Regions:
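Short glycine-aspartate micro-motif
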Residues: 15-19, 69-71, 107, 133, ...
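ATP-binding/phosphotransfer module of carbohydrate and carboxylate kinases, centering on a glycine-rich
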Residues: 1-61, 65, 183-342
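Glycine-rich phosphate-binding loop of actin/hexokinase-like ATP-binding domains
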Residues: 126-197, 279-280, 287-292, 296-301
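Short beta-strand-loop/turn "lid" adjacent to the catalytic site in phosphate-handling enzymes
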Residues: 62-108, 113, 117-126, 143, ...
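Active-site nucleophile and cofactor-binding loops and adjacent substrate-binding regions
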Residues: 44-45, 85-88, 107-114, 133-136, ...
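Conserved phosphate-binding catalytic cores of ATP/NTP-utilizing and phosphoryl-transfer enzymes
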Residues: 2-10, 55, 108-141
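Short, acidic Gly/Pro/Ser/Thr-rich loop/turn segments
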Residues: 25, 77-79, 149-153, 208, ...
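Short, glycine/charged-enriched secondary-structure capping and boundary segments
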Residues: 31-32, 85-87, 122-124, 157-160, ...
Length: 342
């Protein structure tokens, strides 16, 4: 597939963009190529039977024109004309969106593909640098995000075009490295005989890690959620503190591996709901030291900046950038683009 084959014709404005997660669906309306997207009210997915109902609700009472196109990001694989969400009951049906909402075109992308689309536009208060030097212009970028799962995507610059490359990087192997790890890893439950990064580095993985730390320290496991652990760590609970220190160090290891895989001299970006709650632990030395400990390339890794994303919803901004100027990006839409004539 050539870059020319991925060129998207301009969308018919206004374009509705949306980031649909397991709990909330967040939307904005892009009016033209120049103006920022108009933020629309977020909609709890559980409050609506389907995406069409949620879109009607977010537009209701808003002084905006009706959308003519839609670009939506969902958590999960985009295959076929019926796209079930990973963590919600909705099944997104693009042809039903076209028929029910009067749209000309609908494009459905992966959620971390949308995160990658946001990276070239993040700056200022949207991000906080954690070590490294200046990002190189036109160099590859990578985004990794511990949330419900562990999302990952690269953003490659080639032929004057940004190319988002989503994948299943969250399932790479995560084994023990330090003596401390070797005490704890035997207590982490296996999935299919292995421990993938997502089994530890996610909102669901954090209690799993805390339980392993507790058992290794001959303590009773007593945390049931990521929120419990962060609150306990803030109160000085030793198991919770050690859990978050290990979590930060392991996230640094995985982020460093991803950086090496695409030579991400444009920076590695940390997204996801979990990272915002454990930012103090990411700022400490363990995260950055693990990120850089990639012999024989430690010097190279020391130069690569890491950015903690503070933007409340970068995926929507990334989709809006793509909707405004699709020719800036090479996004493969085969099997993911539906039009009114289909």
């Amino acid at each position: 597939m050539s870059l020319t084959e991925t060129r998207q014709r301009p969308f018919a404005f206004p374009v509705l963009v949306g980031d649909v997660g397991g709990t909330n669906a967040r939307f904005a309306l892009v009016l033209d190529e120049e103006t920022p997207g108009i933020k629309l009210p977020s909609q709890p997915t559980a409050a609506h039977p389907d995406i069409n109902a949620a879109i009607r609700a977010c537009l209701e009472g808003q002084d905006v024109p009706a959308p003519r196109s839609a670009v939506i990001a969902v958590a999960g694989p985009v295959t076929g004309d019926r796209i079930p969400l990973t963590n919600a009951s909705w099944v997104v049906e693009p042809l039903q969106m076209i028929a029910g909402l009067g749209l000309r075109d609908v494009v459905i992308l992966n959620d971390f593909e949308a995160q990658a689309l946001a990276l070239p536009g993040l700056s200022g208060e949207d991000i906080e640098q954690i070590g490294g030097g200046e990002p190189l212009a036109g160099a590859s970028k990578f985004v990794v995000g511990p949330g419900t799962g562990l999302g990952a995507a690269a953003m490659i610059y080639a032929a004057d075009t940004w190319v988002p490359v989503p994948g299943e990087g969250g399932h790479v192997e995560l084994g023990p490295v330090t003596p401390e790890d070797y005490e704890i890893w035997p207590h982490i439950p296996r999935n299919g005989g292995r421990i993938g990064a997502e089994e530890v580095l996610s909102g669901t993985g954090l209690p799993r890690l805390a339980g392993a730390v507790a058992r290794a320290r001959k303590a009773e496991p007593h945390f049931t959620s990521a929120a419990d652990i962060t609150q306990a760590a803030n109160a000085g609970d030793p198991v919770a503190v050690e859990t978050l220190e290990i979590f930060a160090r392991c996230l640094g290891r995985v982020a460093g591996d991803f950086a090496l895989s695409v030579l991400a001299r444009g920076g590695v970006y940390i997204a996801g709901g979990v990272s915002s709650h454990i930012a103090p632990f990411l700022r400490k030395g363990g995260f950055r030291a693990a990120f850089e400990a990639k012999a024989p390339h430690a010097k190279l890794m020391a130069s690569i900046p890491v950015f903690l994303i503070h933007h409340p919803n970068p995926a929507v901004d990334g989709l809006a950038a793509y909707a405004r100027t699709p020719d800036r990006f090479a996004v493969g839409t085969k099997g993911r683009h539906w039009s009114a004539q289909d």
